[in-house]
Amino acid sequence: MRVYSHFAVNTLSNTYLVGLPTGRAILIDPAAFDGELLELIEHHSYTVTCILLTHSDEEHLAGLRTIMKVYSDVRICAAMPRIADLTAIPVSDGETLDICGNPVQVIGLPGHGRDCVAFLTGGFLFCGLGLSAGEFGAVSNPYAKAILLANLAESIFTLPDETVILPFYGPPTTVAVERRTLPMEDPLKLAGLA
């Protein structure tokens, strides 16, 4: 398994390409589908067979329709069964997907939205909007922040130190770095609710 990062200038966000030994590939959070991303896929002779969405904000998924035209036999996996006007295979916390023989664990990360999830495979955590290097994901109110922080403490900060965190925004990091950087002693207190 190989992981590639593509930075979309128009959204200032990351899309990830996971290349499998079979020649098939997974795209994660395709905010845009431009020539550079197409070149990355084609250069490695990958065929995109699955798209994983960590959230369903339409403004973050502009590349989705184009990808579906280029790679017609693609399935979309997301927490919600409908993304814009496209059908997705719904996934939920604790589920393990089998994508071309590659196990992908689904981790629920509600907070930014109720439909936010992360995907863990091969020591890489694709966490979407839940976490960025050095900061928690953006939320709309203290209750959402408390929910997000509790989920991060229970589901993400318990992963092995060397787990690589690949966020929607910002550079990669690791669980060890974020555990040292971000205070997690009391999610309710951090959210301003205690």
Regions found by a protein language model. Name each.
Residues 114-194:
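Metallo-beta-lactamase
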Residues 6, 91, 109:
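Hydrophobic residues at beta-strand termini and immediately following loops
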Residues 1-44, 117-128:
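Conserved beta-strand hairpin/beta-sheet module of binuclear metal-dependent hydrolase folds
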Residues 28, 76-78, 127, 167:
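Hydrophobic residues in well-ordered beta-strands that form the structural core
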Residues 12, 25, 32-105, 181-188:
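Active-site HxH/HxHxD metal-binding segment of metal-dependent hydrolases
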Residues 51-61, 107-114, 166-172:
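Histidine-centered catalytic micro-motifs
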Residues 95-96, 102-118, 131:
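Pocket-forming structural segment of enzyme catalytic cores
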